[in-house]
């Protein structure tokens, strides 16, 4: 039961991190209007790529944990 509770907590924290990354991505896109040099654009492009990669990784972790929670719940109910 404790393992299930930990998985649920980690799943919720993962969803919160995904939301924070989406907010960060929006803020970075809003600053794209203030770019003055090519270096600024390259830094912004790399930052956006990193946030998108982090979102993909966190979504994969979320799906794995969600599957684990469902599996554990089915085992407990049987």
Swiss-Prot record:
One GO term describing the cellular component: host cell membrane
Residues spanning the signal sequence: 1-23
Compartments (UniProt record): Host membrane
Its membrane topology: Single-pass membrane protein
Keywords: Host membrane, Membrane, Signal, Transmembrane, Transmembrane helix
Domain of life, source organism: Viruses
Pfam families per UniProt: Corona_7 (PF02398)
InterPro entries in UniProt: Corona_7
Segments passing through the bilayer: 56-76
Family of this protein: Belongs to the coronaviruses ns7/ns7a protein family.
Function: May function in the formation of membrane-bound replication complexes or in the assembly of the virus.
Name of the protein in its database record: Non-structural protein 7
């Amino acid at each position: 039961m404790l393992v299930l509770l930990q998985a649920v907590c980690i799943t919720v924290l993962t969803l919160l991190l995904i939301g924070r990354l989406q907010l960060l991505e929006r803020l970075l896109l809003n600053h794209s209007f203030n770019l003055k040099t090519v270096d600024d654009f390259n830094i912004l492009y790399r930052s956006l790529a990193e946030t998108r990669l982090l979102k993909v990784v966190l979504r994969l972790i979320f799906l794995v944990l969600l599957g684990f929670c469902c599996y554990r719940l089915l085992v407990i109910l049987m």
